[in-house]
């Protein structure tokens, strides 16, 4: 059964705006693709029902994602009928996508509160999908149906329509910007994003980087800021070994979680934002962390304005760099790209 509620899945699709679409008969390769999507900050992945024993690969992939990437929302694509939809839902599909509109498949998904996105190629089919309870309609094949101009035309008289083009969407800033600014709420991208050449070469880092770029281009096209928010302040205790006491006070007083590191302790609650507490009195470590949507773009933006940064710390799922100059109050400031807290 689905791990996430219907609303959780739909909100994640709306928020991220990119649905990577892929198929691979080798479950170990499929796992590495999911790893790459997750490392890029993606929370949605659509595995397609396109090969023999695809259901077995999908079931193993869902189990892997739940254990390794608990925030990853796995769905199934290329579903054309109700029995297939039911089979995949029973094996953990959180959403179902099809190339065509099928009323019985819609009813099956509705019974289990699983989002269904059927392929539609006309305003009439989109209306029929809405009457069947579809929230996000898949425009397929997007390029052949009419491209971004079709989305804009449909949303004129029907601004409430949520359209996810698939087919004809390139993993480029130009293509993504055109679709999003035309009114698409999300984009399904298959071989242009998870390309056969990169998979065959085992270059999953390149897939990760492409997904990361696409996620940023969606946000940029929506007019979202490159700099997200103040992610956390870094404070220090006034006495030796006092960091633990301070952290425990926050945890006990407010019921927050503690994550103990080598030299600092992070405090966090259910919402976004954290507090970093140094274990020892280190005034020079007091700082402010600024969360960014895209690390490379953020660095380039600051440098273009004459703001220098120190050498970056780069890990698969984390990038950070301190500004060389402190803020007017004397606090150090560092950028942070970290999908787990974005």
What is the predicted function of each stretch?
Residues 81-91, 124-132, 170-187:
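Catalytic cores of alpha/beta
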Residues 254-286, 323-339:
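Conserved short beta-strand elements that form part of the metal-binding/catalytic scaffold
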């Amino acid at each position: 059964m689905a791990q996430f509620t219907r609303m959780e899945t739909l909100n994640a699709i709306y928020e991220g705006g990119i649905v990577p679409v892929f198929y691979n008969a080798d479950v170990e390769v499929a796992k590495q693709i999911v790893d790459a999507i997750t490392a890029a900050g993606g929370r949605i992945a659509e595995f397609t029902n396109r090969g023999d024993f695809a259901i077995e690969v999908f079931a193993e992939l869902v189990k892997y994602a739940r254990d390794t990437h608990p925030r990853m929302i796995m769905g199934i694509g290329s579903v054309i009928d109700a029995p297939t939809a039911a089979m995949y839902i029973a094996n953990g599909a959180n959403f179902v996508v099809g190339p065509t509109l099928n009323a019985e498949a819609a009813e099956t998904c509705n019974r289990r509160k699983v989002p269904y996105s059927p392929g539609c190629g006309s305003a009439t089919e989109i209306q029929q999908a809405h009457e069947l309870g579809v929230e996000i309609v898949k425009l397929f094949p997007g390029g052949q149906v009419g491209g971004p101009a079709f989305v804009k035309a449909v949303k004129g008289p029907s601004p409430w329509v949520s359209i996810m083009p698939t087919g004809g969407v390139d993993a480029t800033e130009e293509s993504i910007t055109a679709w999003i600014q035309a009114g698409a709420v999300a984009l399904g991208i298959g071989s242009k994003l998870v390309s056969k050449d990169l998979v065959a070469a085992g270059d999953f880092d390149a897939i990760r980087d492409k997904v990361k770029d696409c996620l940023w281009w969606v946000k940029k096209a929506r007019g979202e800021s490159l700099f997200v928010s103040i992610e956390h302040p870094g404070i220090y205790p006034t006495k030796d070994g006092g960091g633990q006491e301070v952290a425990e006070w926050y945890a006990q007083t407010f019921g927050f979680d503690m994550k103990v590191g080598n030299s600092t302790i992070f405090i966090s609650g259910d919402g976004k934002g954290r507090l970093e507490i140094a274990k020892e009195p280190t005034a020079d470590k007091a700082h402010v962390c600024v969360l960014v949507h895209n690390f490379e773009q953020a660095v380039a933006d600051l440098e273009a304005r004459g703001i220098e940064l120190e050498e970056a710390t780069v890990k698969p799922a984390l990038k950070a760099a301190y500004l060389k100059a402190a803020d007017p109050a004397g606090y150090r400031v560092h950028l942070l790209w970290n999908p787990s807290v974005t």
